[in-house]
Swiss-Prot record:
Lineage: Eukaryota, Viridiplantae, Streptophyta, Embryophyta, Tracheophyta
Subcellular localization: Nucleus
Polar residues: compositionally biased ranges: 198-221, 243-254
Gene behind this protein: BHLH49
One example of a Gene Ontology biological process annotation: regulation of DNA-templated transcription
Name this protein carries in UniProt: Transcription factor bHLH49
InterPro entries named among the record's database cross-references: bHLH_dom, bHLH_ZIP_TF, HLH_DNA-bd_sf
Miscellaneous comment: Plants over-expressing BHLH49 show increased hypocotyl and cotyledon lengths and increased flower size.
Keywords noted in UniProt: DNA-binding, Growth regulation, Nucleus, Transcription, Transcription regulation
Domain bHLH: 309-359
Gene source species: Arabidopsis thaliana
Biased composition (Basic and acidic residues): 1-17
Tissue: Expressed constitutively in roots, stems, and flowers.
Function per UniProt: Transcriptional activator involved in cell elongation. Regulates the expression of a subset of genes involved in cell expansion by binding to the G-box motif.
Length: 486
C-alpha cells in the first residue's frame, strides 16, 4: 500500500462525517443485481461489520434512479463516476491485484462495492465466495464473540477487524508472489484465498507455541518489508520465550520426579535401619504416633513440675506443722500402754481414745466412793457457821437454833455442846493438809478424837465431877498437836 492511501485513510479517520455517511446511507440506495460491466474493486476505506458482511452476497450497492445525483462517503456519483471507477481500478492494480483476475465468469460470484466507503485501508479485495465465508467461520475468525454482536457494533469488533487485516495482508502477498495471469481460471484465485485464510487463522492463535510462524517472503512481498521483518523478529522472540518457558517447566518436573524417588528411598532406608519392626508401614505409623504424642506429654510434665515447685516453696510452714504433729503422736504412743504395737495413725488414735475413756470411768467411780465416805464435805460450812453465830448472839439462852414448829427427831442438845463441836470442826478443817500418802486418814482420826474429848469434858462439867488434871490438860490442847498412836 502506498503513502497516498495511508494519508487518505488517516484523513477519513479524522473526519467523523465519513462514519456517519457510511453507517447511515440514504434511502435511495437498495440492494440489487449490478451489471458485470460496471464492476468496481475494493479499496482503502472504513465500514461497519454489518455492511461488510452484507457485501458477501450475490448483490451489490448501486443507485438505479440517478447515479449522477447521489454521492456516497464523500465521493460524488455525478459526471465524474467514470473517473472514480477508473481511480479505484488503478488503486487496486497498485495494491497487487490484476484486473483480469477480478472479473469473474458471467453468472458467478460478484465483487464488493466501491472501496472508498466499505473496507479498511489494509483490507485486500477478495471475491464474495460462500465457501470462503464458511471456511472463515470455521477457522475461528469470529470466535472472539457472537456474530450478531460484532455486526451490531458501530465500527465492528477490533479483534475481528485485526484478523481481517492480517488476512488481507497475507492475501496481498500471496497474490503478488504468485503473479496470477489473465488466462488462469477463477479456481486459482479461490485456492489462493483458501491458503491465505488458513495462514491468517494460524496467526490468530497467539497462545499456542509456533502460532506466529509466518514466512518473511509473504510479508515482505505485500509492500511492507520493514513491518514484516519486525513482526518476524517478534515472532522469533516469542518462540524463544516459549521454548525457554517449556524447557524450564520440563526441568522443574524432572527435578520433582527425581526428588520423589530419593525421598522414597530415604524412607525405605529408615524403615530398614529401625530395629524391632515386624512391618515397615506399621513401624512408620507407630513412630509418627509417638512423635506426635511426645510433645504434649513433655509440656504436661513441665507444667506439673512448675506447680510442684511452687507448692514446695510455699509449704514450709505446713511441713513444720506436720512434723510437730508427728512428734506429739509419738509422745502419746509412749503414754498409752500397748500403743507401740499398733501401726497406722488411724488405729493408734482409736487406741488413745479408748484409753482416755477408760480413765474417765475410773475417775467417776472414785469420786462416787469419796462422796459416800465423807458426805459433809459438800456443804458450805462457813455460811452455816456464820448464820449460827448470829442466831446465838441475838437470842436468849432458852432459844434454840431451830424454829419451835420444827419437829425434832432427837432431843435438843445443851448449849455448850453445840458451840464446842462447831469450833472443833472449824479447827480441823482449817488445819494444814498433810501429804497424800496417809494424810487423809490422820486428819480424820484427829478430828474424831478431838470431838470425843470435848464430849467427855462437857459431860464432866455438867455432872460437877472433877476430872483428872491430865485429862483436862490433854483436852485443852489443840487437836493439831496431838499424837496419833499406831
Amino acid at each position: 500500500m502506498d503513502l497516498s492511501a495511508k494519508d487518505e485513510f488517516s484523513a477519513e479517520k479524522r473526519n467523523p462525517d465519513n462514519y456517519d455517511s457510511v453507517n447511515n446511507p440514504s434511502g435511495d440506495w437498495r440492494v440489487d443485481s449490478y451489471p458485470s460491466e460496471n464492476l468496481i474493486s475494493a479499496g482503502p476505506a472504513s465500514c461497519s461489520p454489518s455492511q461488510m458482511m452484507d457485501s458477501f452476497g450475490q448483490t451489490l450497492w448501486y443507485d438505479p434512479t440517478s447515479v449522477q445525483a447521489v454521492g456516497y462517503a464523500g465521493f460524488n456519483g455525478g459526471n465524474a463516476s467514470s473517473s472514480s471507477f477508473r481511480g479505484s481500478i488503478d488503486r487496486s492494480l497498485e495494491m497487487g491485484w490484476n484486473l483480469p483476475n477480478l472479473l469473474p465468469p458471467k453468472g458467478n460470484g460478484l465483487f464488493l462495492p466501491n472501496a472508498s466507503s466499505f473496507l479498511p485501508p489494509s483490507m485486500a479485495q477478495f471475491p464474495a465466495d460462500s465457501g470462503f465465508i464458511e471456511r472463515a467461520a470455521r477457522f475461528s475468525l469470529f470466535s472472539g464473540g457472537n456474530f450478531s454482536d460484532m455486526v451490531n457494533q458501530p465500527l465492528g469488533n477490533s479483534e475481528a477487524i485485526g484478523l481481517f487485516l492480517q488476512g488481507g495482508g497475507t492475501m496481498q502477498g500471496q497474490c503478488q508472489s504468485n503473479e496470477l495471469n489473465v488466462g488462469e481460471p477463477h479456481n486459482d484465485v479461490s485456492v489462493a484465498v483458501k491458503e491465505s485464510t488458513v495462514r491468517s487463522s494460524e496467526q490468530a492463535k497467539p497462545n499456542v507455541p509456533g502460532s506466529g510462524n509466518v514466512s518473511e517472503d509473504t510479508q515482505s512481498s505485500g509492500g511492507n518489508g520493514q513491518k514484516g521483518r519486525e513482526t518476524s523478529s517478534n515472532t522469533k522472540k516469542r518462540k524463544r520465550n516459549g521454548q525457554k518457558n517449556s524447557e524450564a517447566a520440563q526441568s522443574h518436573r524432572s527435578q520433582q520426579s527425581e526428588e520423589e524417588p530419593d525421598n522414597n528411598g530415604d524412607e525405605k532406608r529408615n524403615d530398614e535401619q529401625s530395629p524391632n519392626s515386624p512391618g515397615k508401614k506399621s513401624n512408620s505409623g507407630k513412630q509418627q504416633g509417638k512423635q506426635s504424642s511426645d510433645p504434649p506429654k513433655d509440656g504436661y510434665i513441665h507444667v506439673r513440675a512448675r506447680r510442684g515447685q511452687a507448692t514446695n516453696s510455699h509449704s514450709l510452714a505446713e511441713r513444720v506443722r506436720r512434723e510437730k504433729i508427728s512428734e506429739r503422736m509419738k509422745f502419746l504412743q509412749d503414754l498409752v500402754p500397748g500403743c507401740n504395737k499398733v501401726t497406722g495413725k488411724a488405729v493408734m488414735l482409736d487406741e488413745i481414745i479408748n484409753y482416755v475413756q477408760s480413765l474417765q470411768r475410773q475417775v467417776e467411780f472414785l469420786s462416787m466412793k469419796l462422796a459416800t465416805v465423807n458426805p459433809q464435805m459438800d456443804f458450805n460450812l462457813e455460811g452455816l457457821l456464820a448464820k449460827d453465830a448470829l442466831q446465838l448472839r441475838a437470842g436468849s439462852s432458852s432459844t434454840t437454833p431451830f424454829p419451835p414448829n420444827m419437829s425434832m427427831a432427837y432431843p435438843p442438845l445443851p448449849h455448850g455442846f453445840m458451840q464446842q463441836t462447831l469450833s472443833s470442826i472449824g479447827r480441823t478443817i482449817t488445819s494444814p493438809l498433810s501429804p497424800m500418802n496417809g494424810g487423809f486418814k490422820r486428819q480424820e482420826t484427829n478430828g474424831w478424837e478431838g470431838d470425843l474429848q470435848n464430849v467427855i469434858h462437857i459431860n464432866y462439867g455438867a455432872g460437877d465431877v472433877t476430872p483428872d488434871p491430865q485429862a483436862a490438860a490433854t483436852a485443852s490442847l489443840p487437836a493439831a498437836n496431838m499424837k496419833v498412836e499406831p
